[in-house]
């Protein structure tokens, strides 16, 4: 499987968009800042996501992006496929010419892996990732109380 940084970043950015989009369009600059993904890279990814109708853009002041459909209707596989080539673990990209123009001995194994991974990613909806993120335990670290610098005299 060739799940690249492009696919990982696209899923991360879409999750950020889903988490922050309730109040209106989300800017790529905001996603970039929160997720530490370069703005120019996000622009490339969101161009592909928009063409695949996973996001919609809103122009003008207060503009940005929002999901084109509900997060429960969007799988991780949809997102990954939108930004990169299909998931494929075979050496020959499914053409069955991996070994001297013939099928290699392990071709079926890699095809089965393709099916398993694709099925798994198809089953994970963006809404599941949103719920998981929102339900994570947050640890709050309190600063120690400042000590009085002036002693109290009696």
Where do the protein language model's features map onto the residues?
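N-terminal helix-turn-helix DNA-binding core of bacterial DNA-binding proteins
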Residues: 3-37
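Alpha-helical residues within the helix-turn-helix
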Residues: 33, 50-51
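Key DNA-contact positions within bacterial/archaeal DNA-binding proteins
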Residues: 40
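Short, hydrophobic-biased segments on the C-terminal half of alpha helices
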Residues: 46-47
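Beta-hairpin "wing" of winged helix-turn-helix
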Residues: 53-67
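C-terminal regulatory/oligomerization modules of transcriptional regulators
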Residues: 76, 94-154
